[in-house]
Curated annotation (Swiss-Prot):
Function: Antitoxin component of a possible type II toxin-antitoxin (TA) system. The cognate toxin is VapC34.
Superkingdom, taxonomy of origin: Bacteria
Source organism per UniProt: Mycobacterium tuberculosis (strain CDC 1551 / Oshkosh)
InterPro entries hit by this protein: VapB-like
UniProt KW keywords: Toxin-antitoxin system
Protein name: Putative antitoxin VapB34
Length: 70
């Protein structure tokens, strides 16, 4: 209960996190997929999305050629 209180978690959350960390240590890995790979996959998915509006970002936001609101 002390750990849960210090971490600002419920007792259940603290136990789940502790068990996952212990399993990761025992299996010698911290993540099944690295953060780099996960972020790269997100980037690929976003890049594959269709372009729904071909206007320039400034036009969409409503700025003029001087960078002021139009």
């Amino acid at each position: 209960m002390e750990l849960a209180a210090r971490m600002g978690e419920t007792l259940t959350q603290a136990v789940v996190v502790a068990v996952r960390e212990q399993l990761a240590r025992r299996t010698g890995r911290t993540r099944s997929i690295s953060l780099r790979e996960e972020l790269a996959a997100i980037g690929r998915r976003c890049a594959a999305l269709p372009v729904l509006d071909t206007r320039a970002a400034d036009t969409i936001l409503g700025y003029d050629e001087r960078g002021l609101p139009a």
